Amino acid sequence: MTNLRKTHPLMKILNKSFIDLPAPSNITSWWNFGSLLGICLIIQILTGLFLAMHYTSDTMTAFSSVTHICRDVNYGWLIRYLHANGASMFFICLFLHVGRGLYYGSYLFLETWNIGVLLLFAVMATAFMGYVLPWGQMSFWGATVITNLLSAIPYIGSDLVEWIWGGFSVDKATLTRFFAFHFILPFIIAALAGVHLLFLHETGSNNPTGIPSDADKIPFHPYYTIKDILGVILLVLILTSLVLFSPDLLGDPDNYTPANPLNTPPHIKPEWYFLLAYAILRSIPNKLGGVLALVLSILILALMPLLHTAKQRSMMFRPFSQCLFWILVADLITLTWIGGQPVEHPYIIIGQLASILYFLLILVLMPITSLLENNMLKW
């Protein structure tokens, strides 16, 4: 009798993706983050679903409905904080996943990489709209400031902003549509993640050496299922520790004040995972220039395959490129710190220098260094 998992139309797809999938024998824990992102997405969809059962997307009741969830709903506080901190875990895994891709040259799988960039944009859009829903001070003013950036687009900008707002300011119409989009986008993300996997399995996984590993493959199950379970246990442990011991560690105290259009908070800043892009936006005095830099800071990832000048795929055997990669990581941490600081000396100049260094590293220094390494190896 043939094995059901190899013959059943549905089981066959799962079998080829998660059980009998040939995987390189030498992939490290850096390859765990794909599965962790899948777990994060499942956690977010489930907790979000239960929150949506009690949330009301009306400006008059949104804030009190979140309060009601935390105080009156059974384990509502747990669901709410799992959802809020789950987003932070999602972005930590995302940044590490993208960083792994940059370090080991995974961006040379063009379709997989481009869908990954699209996924990053979709997750950022979802997180931004989710932050608006509790209708606290930072929700309202964050929504006002970020949506207002679109007014920098020549000719159609101001019309576009009013069209997104559904009026002349961030109000009931804005909140309702943000809730609708925040609800539907995770399912679109799940579908895109499926396509991301589909393209990945067309080529097979990359590995730390960057050398094709067709001659040395092992089955995904049990080797990498066990390895992934360890990652999941650590992820859940960190997330539950954060939720149970310090749920507001990554949030903003201003968001516990109901939204007030007549009172601007002293420092408007987004959640920590947007601070690096926010710092790049703020470092350019011109509005349109800032918006372009903001978009390019993420869109630059799509250019990575074009900027790859090295003869070797991975950075594993390229010490100079490794140095620049870790300088880039330090630069991104600096930008994250600057994004949370007030706009005053010396933070302005540090932010501007860090922003210049970010683009300089990716567009100029790293490709030149790769060419230099090729030359040193007589390639």
From Swiss-Prot:
Q: How does it sit in the membrane?
A: Multi-pass membrane protein
MF annotations from Gene Ontology: metal ion binding; ubiquinol-cytochrome-c reductase activity
Record note on cofactor: Binds 2 heme b groups non-covalently.
This protein's cofactor list reads: heme b
Q: What does this protein do?
A: Component of the ubiquinol-cytochrome c reductase complex (complex III or cytochrome b-c1 complex) that is part of the mitochondrial respiratory chain. The b-c1 complex mediates electron transfer from ubiquinol to cytochrome c. Contributes to the generation of a proton gradient across the mitochondrial membrane that is then used for ATP synthesis.
For this UniProt record, the keywords arranged alphabetically read as follows:
Electron transport, Heme, Iron, Membrane, Metal-binding, Mitochondrion, Mitochondrion inner membrane, Respiratory chain, Transmembrane, Transmembrane helix, Transport, Ubiquinone
- Family per similarity comment: Belongs to the cytochrome b family.
* Protein name per Swiss-Prot or TrEMBL: Cytochrome b
Assembly and partners are described as: The cytochrome bc1 complex contains 11 subunits: 3 respiratory subunits (MT-CYB, CYC1 and UQCRFS1), 2 core proteins (UQCRC1 and UQCRC2) and 6 low-molecular weight proteins (UQCRH/QCR6, UQCRB/QCR7, UQCRQ/QCR8, UQCR10/QCR9, UQCR11/QCR10 and a cleavage product of UQCRFS1). This cytochrome bc1 complex then forms a dimer.
